Amino acid sequence: MRKWTVPSVLFLLCPSLSSSCQGRKIHANAEADSDAPVDPPKVEDKIGAVPNGLSTDSDVAKREAESMSMRNLRSDAEKFEFQAEVSRLMDIIINSLYSNKDIFLRELISNASDALDKIRFLALTDKEILGEGDTAKLEIQIKLDKEKKILSIRDRGIGMTKEDLIKNLGTIAKSGTSAFVEKMQTSGDLNLIGQFGVGFYSVYLVPDYVEVISKHNDDKQYIWESKADGAFAISEDVWNEPLGRGTEIRLHLRDEAQEYLDEFKLKELVKRYSEFINFPIYLWASKEVEVEVPAEEDDSSDDEDNKSESSSSEEGEEEETEKEEDEKKPKTKKVKETTYEWELLNDMKAIWLRNPKDVTDDEYTKFYHSLAKDFSEEKPLAWSHFTAEGDVEFKAFTLLPPKAPQDLYESYYNSNKSNLKLYVRRVFISDEFDELLPKYLNFLKGLVDSDTLPLNVSREMLQQHSSLKTIKKKLIRKALDMIRKIADEDPDEANDKDKKEVEESTDNDEKKGQYAKFWNEFGKSIKLGIIEDAANRNRLAKLLRFESTKSEGKLTSLDQYISRMKSGQKDIFYITGTSKEQLEKSPFLERLTKKNYEVILFTDPVDEYLMQYLMDYEDKKFQNVSKEGLKIGKDSKDKELKESFKELTKWWKGALASENVDDVKISNRLANTPCVVVTSKYGWSSNMERIMQSQTLSDASKQAYMRGKRVLEINPRHPIIKELRERVVKDAEDESVKQTARLMYQTALMESGFMLNDPKEFASSIYDSVKSSLKISPDATVEEEDDTEEAEAESGTTESSAAEDAGAETLDLKDEL
């Protein structure tokens, strides 16, 4: 007989299932039949009701009630002792302080599903094995009894023989149990349950007494019971109604586990963990309805007796007529009553198991709203539905929401929460990890369903699982392809030469502007991906969008930029700043714009970090136009100008020695501005300096190191620069000329986006310049205030305060009297 792992122990195997490939066959057939209609149980049906053709003992109910009330092992049952390791295991589980006890229901439903899978597989070759009537219904039922504090889970699966009950509920492979106990003692994490084949023992998280009633087609009905005290008992079941076939588990809940007698709690757990189980899950749920009941005589309306005697005779006649008609009608009233009926909890089908070609857009949209708990009417921007085959087989379904959550980036690096849910054989495992998708794609909603990952896999084991890297790699590729497809189908994203052709071939206006919508919501995530994911950096770069000096207020891509590059242009030009308006006025763009070069405008703070990682694209380097190294063609007069201003540049560098200026050079980027300050190629730009200085925990020493060298570039064609050269040639020691040179440098710093180290000094220089232009003597001083008037004012204030204090004291005295 094949050994099955204990997560499916409850509803165990059949001796005929010996082939190693049967498990896969079971699931394959389960998928094929998953949409088969199943009639819900009737309202009057009971868990464990007698199937057609079977009789019941008249004293069954009495003996059953006595057994439940005692919560003791039956005296005539055959008793067994658990293995030593199992006893230790249950002690750890029961006494653990770990809060997630909810997994017990997931385990039991998963086991029930396994049992139903097995009986359905056997029925493929022998239809009679299913039986008739209710016994043939492949479903799971959950029922609770608040008075007796019992939670019952029932299935009509394969059931267990007496031997199965002993073998699978009382023993575990010693090596697996020992390893599990050791792991539990060190980590205390109950999510490890099931990884070592001990899933059934999670039931001891909530009850102090467990009954497992099971009927296999090849054996009598037996009852397995345990109080988790190191022993269990098995006896032929003569206390309960015949099951027909299948298993029912009754959990006699401890006082501290009464929350699991709440219908809402059970519905929530089923929705969370077992929503896509292959079989219908029903809950015996209460429901308030209004019903009409006969009204008592005292409740009958006697409004006619209280009518005012002043009523008109006509009104009286009408009332008499109405009264006669009312007397003819049966007297009833509406009251609220609590009724019970079987409520289907998992009506949402696992559409990822179907062929994508067979799923409609409306079905995808409906599934998105259910999965994402999005109650708006907006459709997802896109979705990706695929099956991966090969060494690792899994099905995946990812969706792109229409809007980003408000807190998407608030805890970007600190949260383990993922919007991608992991399922194993349609059983929800976890969303408390980020190993299946990188953080920058965490805005995607969806799920992964794998048959190769172990059930109840923990975050720690998931990180080490050999299949994980393969799954992650395929998910990333499919996600980026999905996003790329939005751009490819958007007419606004076509190159200028292809736009007309795309617009003519596109008859779906819904796709127009979709990528701009995506970028406005999730563009920052793509930039973070370029920073974090070196392997997919080029793919992500194709998804970048930005404004430029030629984009006319619209977003453009790197491919579109390259298609518009001038002949002979080797670099991709860009500049960073706080806003588009500020950058368009930047002196760094003057000559580039004049020569019709396109410059990318980066205005997001993350763009500074982005460009530290995105060094090139399609064999073209990126060049920050506010840094050294800008090449935009040579001027025939460059050498002549450089020689002509050699004396000025040398003098100016010396005059700015205290400002830590590395050099003064002739500029090739200025047209109308006299001078600008640029930084070294690998140093921080002015925008980056401002960002880093705003950081709460910034390191001053690192800032000084990363600031880079500053170079003053002058415009040799500007009249101010020409005049300054003449002044220097005439008298290089003129203090006013030196002051003018320093003032121009400080002004250039501000215009280039830098922050001044000493704003007060700069302001004083400006005021001195204003004095000079107004022909005010440099020795002129500010008129001093008259101290006498100030002293008299202070004296008057003191006397007034004293008078007010005296008046206040008088009032206080009057109040006391």
UniProtKB/Swiss-Prot annotation:
Glycans are attached at N111, N306, N416, N456, N624. Coiled coil: none annotated. It holds the Pfam family HATPase_c_3. Residues 794-805 have a biased composition (Low complexity). Its main location: endoplasmic reticulum. CDD domains: HATPase_Hsp90-like. Residues 1-20 form the signal peptide. One of its GO terms (cellular component) is endoplasmic reticulum lumen. The keyword Glycoprotein applies. GO terms for molecular function: ATP binding; ATP hydrolysis activity; ATP-dependent protein folding chaperone; unfolded protein binding. Residues 293-325, 781-793 have a biased composition (Acidic residues). InterPro entries: HATPase_C_sf (IPR036890), Heat_shock_protein_90_CS (IPR019805), HSP90_C (IPR037196), Hsp90_fam (IPR001404), Hsp90_N (IPR020575), Ribosomal_Su5_D2-typ_SF (IPR020568). It comes from the Eukaryota. ATP binds at N111, D155, N168, F200. Keywords: ATP-binding, Calcium, Chaperone, Endoplasmic reticulum, Glycoprotein, Nucleotide-binding, Signal. Residues 31-58, 293-333, 777-817 are annotated as: Disordered. Not detected in extracts from young plants unless they are exposed to heat shock for several hours. Found to be constitutively expressed in cell cultures. It is found in: Endoplasmic reticulum lumen. The record marks R459 as: Important for ATP hydrolysis. PROSITE patterns: ER_TARGET (PS00014), HSP90 (PS00298). A motif (Prevents secretion from ER) lies at residues 814-817. Belongs to the heat shock protein 90 family. May have a molecular chaperone role in the processing of secreted materials. This is Endoplasmin homolog. It comes from Catharanthus roseus.
